Amino acid sequence: NLLHKLNIMAGLRADYSSEYGIFLTPRVHAKWEIIHGLTWRASAGKGYRTPMPLAENNFMLASSRKMVIPDRLKQEEAINVGTSLNALIPLGEREVSLTVDFYRTNFLEQVVRDVDSSTDKVVFSDLEGTSFSNAFQAELLYEIFKGFTVNAAYRSNVVKQTISGQLREMPLTSRYKGLLSMSYATRMKKWQFDLTSQFNGGGRMPDPDALNPLWSTEFKPFTVVNAQVTKNFKRWSFYAGAENLLNFMMDNPVIGAADPWGKDFDGTMIWGPVHGRKIYAGLRFTINDYN
């Protein structure tokens, strides 16, 4: 009977806040092993969060923008649902692990950080309209031959929020991300070789001043590649590697950097690497080996 392998767990949590009173947080999880090597999971629930706009957005102080925060903001409230399917697929003498996920968060109440209406201030307010986040991810893991593993993943992000009466993409949020990593370990793990590529999609920038645009309306996709080689001894490990091998950097990460006290200064428009290629080397010493 397939239903014998279906597990469902539900819960309900009650909280009391001196500011917001009593609120309930329901949650349900399900897991179903449909057949051997094919597992389905799902979850749904409701969540609350007390906003602290200044503490959570203190990075905005690295700009000349004035922060406008009302005396009282509503407690954030969201419904989240998600599902995933994991399959173990025989391929040769090994198995490919394939996982597909989809998660959605729908905000009923949310604090909106508006950096679009004006370039000289950031305005915090309660949500008036729709706000949601959809995330789809697929991941593949496979050991091609003994010691050599490949991991590939792709994630699509659709994050939108009502800002000044318009449903728009959240600024400075990549529309997609990708990962490709390869790892090879020799016999007895005497040598370890790792190569990782991170793919970052483009996205929307906060609206620039229409009369004096100091940045683009979009940021472009970019790729970051890291590599490392490790030589292992009984207690010592020597390693060397490089970060950001392609040496990709933002052209002008800080707006108005020449005049930090000017009205155009803004160090919050960071969407990519601000440091170039880095070469490093080091060693590790293991005091206790529990293996």
Predicted regions and their residues:
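Residue-level signature of outer-membrane beta-barrel architecture
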Residues: 1-4, 14, 22, 32-33, ...
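Gram-negative outer-membrane beta-barrel transporters
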Residues: 4-8, 97-106, 126-208, 284-291
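Hydrophobic, lipid-facing positions within transmembrane beta-strands of outer-membrane proteins
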Residues: 12, 24-30, 69, 79-83, ...
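Transmembrane beta-strands of outer-membrane beta-barrel pores
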Residues: 12-18, 44-50, 57-59, 87-89, ...
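Outer-membrane beta-barrel translocator domains and adjoining extracellular loop/strand segments
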Residues: 20-26, 53-59, 66, 110-119, ...
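Membrane-embedded beta-barrel scaffold of Gram-negative outer-membrane proteins
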Residues: 33, 39-41, 74-126, 132
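Outer-membrane beta-barrel translocator/channel fold
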Residues: 39-88, 202-206
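C-terminal beta-signal and adjacent terminal beta-strands/loops
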Residues: 150, 187, 199-206, 230-291
